[in-house]
Amino acid sequence: MGETTGERALTRLHSMRERIGDSLSAHTNELVAVFSRLVNQGKGMLQPHQIIAEYNAAIPEGEREKLKDSALEDVLRGAQEAIVIPPWIALAIRPRPGVWEYLRINVSQLGVEELSVPEYLQFKEQLVDGSTQNNFVLELDFEPFNASFPRPSLSKSIGNGVQFLNRHLSSKLFHDKESMYPLLNFLRAHNYKGMTMMLNDRIRSLDALQGALRKAEKHLAGITADTPYSEFHHRFQELGLEKGWGDCAQRVRETIHLLLDLLEAPEPSALEKFLGTIPMVFNVVILSPHGYFAQANVLGYPDTGGQVVYILDQVRAMENEMLLRIKQQGLNITPRILIVTRLLPDAHGTTCGQRLEKVLGTEHTHILRVPFRTENGTVRKWISRFEVWPYLETYTDDVAHEISGELQATPDLIIGNYSDGNLVACLLAHKLGVTHCTIAHALEKTKYPNSDLYWKKFEDHYHFSCQFTADLIAMNHADFIITSTFQEIAGNKETVGQYESHMAFTMPGLYRVVHGIDVFDPKFNIVSPGADMSIYFPFTESQKRLTSLHLEIEELLFSDVENTEHKFVLKDKKKPIIFSMARLDHVKNLTGLVELYGRNPRLQELVNLVVVCGDHGKESKDKEEQAEFKKMFNLIEQYNLNGHIRWISAQMNRVRNGELYRYICDMRGAFVQPALYEAFGLTVIEAMTCGLPTFATAYGGPAEIIVHGVSGYHIDPYQNDKASALLVEFFEKCQEDPNHWIKISQGGLQRIEEKYTWKLYSERLMTLSGVYGFWKYVTNLDRRETRRYLEMLYALKYRKMATTVPLAIEGEASTK
């Protein structure tokens, strides 16, 4: 798990062991005091906050000052978990993001030893099976396949994969004239449905290419910058140059200059810019099978939330960028984007039963729905995202057939979303030999603590054996991985990233992951999305405000009627509102928000609470949602919150939701996102884009989106009293100084403009697709060895596990 090679990792681990050994002689009493307290906890696993609590309890504050910067403090503060099996304590230590070390301490004998990853995982497994049997266990290790592959070594390089890749491979590939031939071949291979682009058969060598480019340059010097390509098309064909260089003389000249500069003195940023200007992506397929995927009346249905919004906004921005690039390249090609999702015959008033649906606000983007099927025919009912695994292989074959018919071509890029979409994208890209991009949105392993170690307890309901295996396969197969934040990859100083948690873990009785993913891998790229600016815009833009919706919004918030759309009534309708909107599930933690509000009488004096989640009109079939529904009612009754809270059913009208955010801005309220973990935080972006001061979880993406105290606030969902105190402090300060609310509102808007817009996103995604497509063509970046290993894992492990997931019983009611 070292930073570069196994040898360096061992050196570092050994030095850590020596430092602990030195501390034993220098601070024996303190070490004994701390580790004895840990061992006295008995067999089990301790989390970081528990380890630090025991350290603080064992060592008086004055003595702790003397231990600052000691090996003991470094180890305890860097420990992400402690496995206690008396008299042993094993520690997983994380000196910095992406770098791990493992130690085991015998508290009776005060002995310290380093552990390899398999040794640590084997020790950890004793918490489950209680034995130390050395029976052969399947170990998954992807590191040998990447041993000769370039990777950065600094944590700050994580998520900037394309820059590193260009830098490294440019120097390796373009070191002399002969090494430039792959670039020539790449340009010669460019075509679309039989139409030759960039170069024709007249150019067969680098000398011929450079000669043609210089002649073209000379020709362009004699015509005006705005001369259309069509006017010198025939001359260029004679030189061996085809369409794709640009739509006018000026743009063609710029592209030719870029290539000439590359041929003479390769430079990474110039290479990236050149690859971003040439035609490469015309047909894109986006996979998102689960849930109810449609453009209206679905948000709030089970498994249907931010991912749907993300993809619909994504494709609008992508189509605009593709059309712009194709025009600038001087081509007359119609791009196509297909969002492939599941067709639901039991569509419940949505368009989910419609095979093909055009995406509003686009010209060439459609939702293509393909049903799940078994040997008994089409599956009609909605299926939880945790139960889709038996259907996906057949689904992939059906999707391949459908997209071939729709596109009449092979896609240039396949993008997967979430675990099921990523697995289908992986199988499809593998089958078609297409560039494959993965977007996780959320990796469930990080949302459910210890769901790997105790996977058997979760298996009947969640089937994590299938899901975690699918995640491993997809992330290792992908040509590039897009994340919204650094946190998603490698967390921060205190918390472990989603992908980082897949570096090493164990599922006792199934397999042991010795090296699952490398967060330093240059396939990782941070590309942050935004909000749809036509819907979400600042509350201060009065000319765009949808004031015609205010009566509806006031009815929603303040009417004294309780019905299937809203429960409970607000007494004081003048108070500011704390607002939250999310799916009603355990991880989104809206019940936690209600509880922290209920436990703080001062907060109730200052503000009302409005939560939007669930559906009062229909009983959910989702077990987790049912449990949270019941818990919400119990909390409202327990804390006597009627009069202070409004519980509104999930709202599917995004346009009205945008004005709802702005209406709450008018009331000088705030948005709170209290999730136990949030991969990104699209509602955080939406609220901030409207100018609503935002308080969001410190766990996951929002910690990166928000600069604490400047553009919003971080809250710890595990420390309700501190979170509610922060809210009280904010609203009291706003009462004293109304400009404080404005200051935080403007700070949020500025943050969005700088980093979180769909235009920036689409430009970056198209460039990444071109760059990785190029490197895949000219090098061994397609990682054939890894993919053969993945085929074996899929065939021998995943397929068998998928058969254990029960198929849907069609006779049951299929409602949400």
Swiss-Prot record:
Keywords: Glycosyltransferase, Transferase. Gene3D superfamilies: 1.20.120.1230, 3.10.450.330, Glycogen Phosphorylase B (3.40.50.2000). It comes from the Eukaryota. It catalyses: an NDP-alpha-D-glucose + D-fructose = a ribonucleoside 5'-diphosphate + sucrose + H(+). Signal peptide: none annotated. Pfam families: Glycos_transf_1, GT-B_Sucrose_synth, SUS_EPBD, SUS_N. Residues 280-757 are annotated as: GT-B glycosyltransferase. GO terms for biological process: sucrose metabolic process. Its EC number is 2.4.1.13. Expressed in parenchymatous tissues, aleurone layers and cell surrounding the vascular tissue in seeds (at protein level). Predominantly expressed in caryopses. SUPFAM superfamilies: UDP-Glycosyltransferase/glycogen phosphorylase. One of its GO terms (molecular function) is sucrose synthase activity. The keyword Membrane does not apply. The keyword Nucleus does not apply. Sucrose-cleaving enzyme that provides UDP-glucose and fructose for various metabolic pathways. PANTHER family: PTHR45839, SUCROSE SYNTHASE 3. Belongs to the glycosyltransferase 1 family. Plant sucrose synthase subfamily. This is Sucrose synthase 3. It comes from Oryza sativa subsp. japonica (Rice).
